[in-house]
UniProtKB/Swiss-Prot annotation:
Gene3D superfamilies, per database record: Bira Bifunctional Protein, Domain 2, Nucleic acid-binding proteins
Record-linked PANTHER family: LYSINE--TRNA LIGASE, CHLOROPLASTIC_MITOCHONDRIAL (PTHR42918:SF15), LYSYL-TRNA SYNTHETASE (PTHR42918)
The species this protein was found in: Escherichia coli O157:H7
Name of a matching Pfam family: tRNA-synt_2
The keyword Aminoacyl-tRNA synthetase belongs to this UniProt entry's keyword annotation: yes
Manner of cofactor binding, per the entry note: Binds 3 Mg(2+) ions per subunit.
Main localisation: cytoplasm
Gene name per UniProt: lysS
Protein name: Lysine--tRNA ligase
Amino acid sequence: MSEQHAQGADAVVDLNNELKTRREKLANLREQGIAFPNDFRRDHTSDQLHAEFDGKENEELEALNIEVAVAGRMMTRRIMGKASFVTLQDVGGRIQLYVARDDLPEGVYNEQFKKWDLGDILGAKGKLFKTKTGELSIHCTELRLLTKALRPLPDKFHGLQDQEARYRQRYLDLISNDESRNTFKVRSQILSGIRQFMVNRGFMEVETPMMQVIPGGAAARPFITHHNALDLDMYLRIAPELYLKRLVVGGFERVFEINRNFRNEGISVRHNPEFTMMELYMAYADYKDLIELTESLFRTLAQDILGKTEVTYGDVTLDFGKPFEKLTMREAIKKYRPETDMADLDNFDSAKAIVESIGIHVEKSWGLGRIVTEIFEEVAEAHLIQPTFITEYPAEVSPLARRNDVNPEITDRFEFFIGGREIGNGFSELNDAEDQAQRFLDQVAAKDAGDDEAMFYDEDYVTALEHGLPPTAGLGIGIDRMVMLFTNSHTIRDVILFPAMRPVK
């Protein structure tokens, strides 16, 4: 047996022994009728205590004679004869407990406390004081075991090192990893901040179907499910767009939704099949209004959540304080591929030669607009590090966007890039029912030609447009990628609590 295998076998034996010992302790607690009490109530969390009392000297704390009740998980314990120090962790952070034998009811220290294990959940009452080193602590007069942990915590010095285990057992990751806990706190703050921002601008939050008869609103491969009561195959939504615009037709002129989308596609550091989007629709507005809104949203969130408009991402400082850059798709191609002759982007054969020269195979169904878009994605996208809006997307790749009045080959659309990746997509909405019907037919033709991400024909949506959609602009922002930026995370799995994983066999 190799040394590595021997160590692995020893670890399994140690774990089994640990589990056996802890289960025996739980059995003893059951016999005493105190296994899982539910009558302890705390009055503070650790962060509340630190915020209110860290600035006070010990003499002041003694004079105030403040008694508090806290609860949390025992992360460390230092037993020094008749007294011990415990680190208790709760939702707000950590607080130190000072546990002395003679300050607790008889028998609690030796017969109970010393037999408890790291990972157990405790309730503690006592008075605040500061140690000689100035650490805010609680001098315990009551200490109770609230939940017996049967499994040990990850090694306190190394935490949960296996990256895959962090995702599969997120609860252990959250217990042992401060950075991970902070990431999801920031995520919650972002969601709350977006909602407040939208409400302040007069938007109404709505909910639209997660299961749809026709998957629409984006070019993607859907998940299929079956509705037993209706005996009907349905699709998990790939986007809420068409339902939200139906609401604008109905008179709700400013709507937004934050919810999950599902796309049956690949998994990568940037993609998870189940992801969170915020989509909004605003009547009597165009894509330029949404450029302003997007810029203001990111600047506001950065200031409110991080306290500054400069965000560190990897080795780069992203500046949300200054005006965001704005380039047309063709300008971006020229900027990052200077040898490009702009006239070549107006000619199918010339553009095809360019895209093939950079290693992209041209499908038979592609027109000039798709080819130019592929060139942009290959030569420019990765360079868009600072916040940048790219405009003038071809109509061919924008089946739901309004054509430009001057040049009908392009649309009044933008995509928003930060850190070399798309974060948002917005455009003036197509509200010409006949034009929309034709574009749906074009998408059906592309699907028949083998493009399994092309859109279905949605007759009811066309009917809704025939009743009249006001001039409207719409925007979608990827929440997961936004959280990645604000938390300096470099894989989408780090910002999704339970990312998609292949089951363990």
